[in-house]
Amino acid sequence: LLSRGLGDVYKRQIILVGEMRDYETISAALTAAETGHLVMSTLHTTGAAQTIDRIIDACPAGMQNQVRTQLASVLNGVITQCLIPNARGNGRVVATEILVGTDAVCNQIRENKCHQLGSLMQSGSSVGMHTLNGDLSRLVQNGMINRQMAYKYSNDVAELDQYL
């Protein structure tokens, strides 16, 4: 049923898939992207590398290399965001992690080296990339959030220590 519904939306230039939780949805989204559509989706993850891993891990073991290759060939980027209580305690501030689908990033995905994406994000500021910890550090330094909240929302406390 889902693949039939996605077949109908192939007539559109931009496709929004609610959440990619299963192989059928992931496969249909990748096929749409391969045919030139801009496909956007959501996943509940704490970072870009975890997002890539979750997409691949949701697929049958025998299909994971193919999915990894497909994803690497169509990925434009991954944006992770979380809303964090602000320093004043009267609202929230968004912290982000941005991974851009550069040749180096896509090569790491293709080679199953997602654990190295963090270092590519750290060195990729010229193309708009940054890690969540880099953004948390910026928010602390600008007085927008306190250190306690930065540590609570960090996906790698040891790395955050290096930034702060």
Residue ranges, per PLM feature:
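Short, conserved clusters of charged catalytic residues that mark active-site
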Residues: 1, 24, 131
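Single conserved hydrophobic/aromatic residue that forms the stacking wall/gate
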Residues: 1-10
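Conserved ATPase "switch" residues in P-loop NTPase domains
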Residues: 8, 33-34, 140
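Outer-membrane beta-barrel domain signature
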Residues: 8, 26-27, 163
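Conserved P-loop NTPase nucleotide-binding/switch module
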Residues: 12-83, 113
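Conserved P-loop NTPase
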Residues: 74-164
